[in-house]
Design a protein with these regions (language model features):
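Hydrophobic residues in well-ordered beta-strands that form the structural core
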Residues: 35, 72, 97-99, 215
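N-terminal Rossmann-like dinucleotide-binding module
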Residues: 1-29, 151
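Beta-loop-alpha module in the N-terminal Rossmann-like domain of NAD(P)-dependent dehydrogenases
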Residues: 18, 29-87
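Contiguous beta-strand/loop segments that form the cofactor/metal-binding neighborhood of enzyme cores
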Residues: 148-223, 254-257, 261-274
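Mid-domain beta-loop-alpha active-site segment that forms a flexible
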Residues: 100-107, 130-161, 174, 283-284
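C-terminal helix-rich "cap/oligomerization" subdomain common to oxidoreductases
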Residues: 46-49, 95, 184, 266-301
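A short helix->loop->beta-strand "cap" motif at the edges of active sites that frequently abuts
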Residues: 31, 66-68, 92-96, 187
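A contiguous active-site-proximal alpha/beta segment in oxidoreductase catalytic domains
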Residues: 77-134
Length: 301
């Protein structure tokens, strides 16, 4: 739908294993349906893969072999070997691969990184109602992967230690996971993801030496709390005071945008103008490696 709204794309059609579903999409958006993926790939120079995670590798490799720039919805792949093979094939053919970590295009996060933050501690919470559609992978690859990606972009340092706990409740994989990442520069991140929540929540809290930022990625709002050294100069926004220090609160305004449109537009700009890809295959692999390490820690427990 968002690709149809973008003048950089000429949507040639859609492929779906389910012919009934494919016909419905074809009718709804007035695009051609292809029951043979090769016929569609022969008409394209770029593809968007929004299929179950277990199929990403096979479809992406086929697209690259047909000389198509490739957008792959998260998670990149279900194992590292496949992700590396996709990266290698794309590089050999001089093709672009973008991974669908959509929160990079969330206007709240984009606004936040404009402050050039220097985190010392981060905490993420990503809660969602149960959805059968995502249970081919655990909650780490389904939900937490977004926050791993965001945190790695905020703390571009190697991780020295990972610990994790999780539970399986409805599905055959982990539905609730908490992970702790300790970086070599002594920054720590605490991540929680659950797909068993009544209400959705996507929050990121970032603590710096003198600033605390609370990002609501779901409701597109942000508040920043700043430590002031002279409490006598406070204003009505002060929320705490102690001796000569105070903490003031400021709400940061954010303009709502369609993150999915922005994500696909960025993909098109990278193809047309060779604009750097925000989440390329290399970054996608780095995020996957941490996700799989969290899985490993859970299995050890």
């Amino acid at each position: 739908e968002q690709a149809l709204k973008n003048e950089n794309f000429n949507v040639r059609g859609v492929y779906d294993l389910n012919e009934i579903r494919g016909a419905e999409i074809s009718k709804k958006y007035n695009v051609d349906y292809f029951s043979d993926i090769n016929q569609l790939l022969n008409k394209c120079n770029a593809v968007s893969i929004v299929t179950p995670a277990s199929t990403h590798y096979e479809i992406a490799l086929k697209a690259l072999e047909n000389n198509c720039h490739t957008f792959i919805e998260k998670p990149f792949c279900t194992n590292i070997k496949h992700a590396h093979e996709i990266q290698k094939t794309a590089e050999e053919k001089n093709l672009l691969v973008q991974i669908g970590h959509i929160e990079q295009f969330n206007p709240v996060f984009k606004k936040f990184i404009s402050f050039n933050p220097k985190p010392v501690f981060l905490e993420s919470e990503r809660l969602a109602p149960f959805n059968k559609r995502g249970i081919d992978v655990d909650v780490i690859l389904d939900l937490m992967i977004h926050d791993i990606d965001l945190i790695l972009s905020l703390v571009p340092t190697k991780i020295k230690n990972i610990s994790a706990n999780g539970v399986q409740i409805l599905s055959n994989s982990y539905d609730l996971v908490n992970a702790r990442l300790e970086f070599q520069n002594n920054v720590t991140a605490n991540l929680t993801a659950s797909r068993l929540s009544i209400q959705p929540m996507r929050k990121l809290r970032v603590f710096e030496s003198n600033v605390y930022s609370s990002l609501d990625l779901n409701n597109l709002s942000m508040a920043r709390y700043t430590v002031n050294q002279n409490s006598k100069n406070h204003n009505e926004n002060v929320v705490f005071e102690l001796d000569d220090k105070s903490v003031s609160r400021k709400t940061v305004s954010v303009n709502a945008i369609n993150a999915l449109y922005e994500e696909l537009d960025s993909f098109s700009q990278s193809i047309i103008n060779r604009k750097p890809i925000i989440v390329d295959a290399k970054k996608g692999i780095q995020t996957l490696e941490i996700a799989f390490e969290i899985q490993k820690k859970l299995n050890e427990n």
